[in-house]
Amino acid sequence: MAKDYSRTQRIGDQMQRELAQLIQREIKDPRLGLVTITGVEVSRDVAHAKVFITVMGQDDAGKIALNMEILNDAAGYLRMLLGKSMKLRSVPQLHFHYDESIRRGAELSALIERAVAEDGRRHGDDETED
């Protein structure tokens, strides 16, 4: 069981590296933003792969959806190119998903900074009253 997990993990890691290069070199759509692949999860049977991406500088939901549409439309082409570059019996179907973790991380960081600043103001006010 542990060996199966490590194999799918290795395949996912290699797919992440290969896809990053393929998207940069082979997808010529000018509407496509600066795509970063944050991770690839491969199913146990290696039939499907979830590809998690972010788009640099894009917070607009419409532009993100457009980038997702472009990548999902190119999934078959990218799968064919992966088949040529990777030595796998069968190449997984690619399913692109937008990775919200970076945006959520920035929101949490801002929330923590705000709480620390507010706490500092409160404690600063308490010290001046004494």
From Swiss-Prot:
GO terms for molecular function: ribosomal small subunit binding. Keywords: Cytoplasm, Ribosome biogenesis. One of its GO terms (biological process) is maturation of SSU-rRNA. SUPFAM superfamilies: Ribosome-binding factor A, RbfA (SSF89919). One of several proteins that assist in the late maturation steps of the functional core of the 30S ribosomal subunit. Associates with free 30S ribosomal subunits (but not with 30S subunits that are part of 70S ribosomes or polysomes). Required for efficient processing of 16S rRNA. May interact with the 5'-terminal helix region of 16S rRNA. One of its GO terms (cellular component) is cytosol. The keyword Thylakoid does not apply. HAMAP family: RbfA. Its main location: cytoplasm. It is found in: Cytoplasm. Monomer. Binds 30S ribosomal subunits, but not 50S ribosomal subunits or 70S ribosomes. This is Ribosome-binding factor A. Belongs to the RbfA family. It comes from Pseudomonas aeruginosa (strain LESB58). InterPro entries: KH_dom-like_a/b, RbfA, RbfA_dom_sf, Ribosome-bd_factorA_CS. PROSITE patterns: RBFA (PS01319).
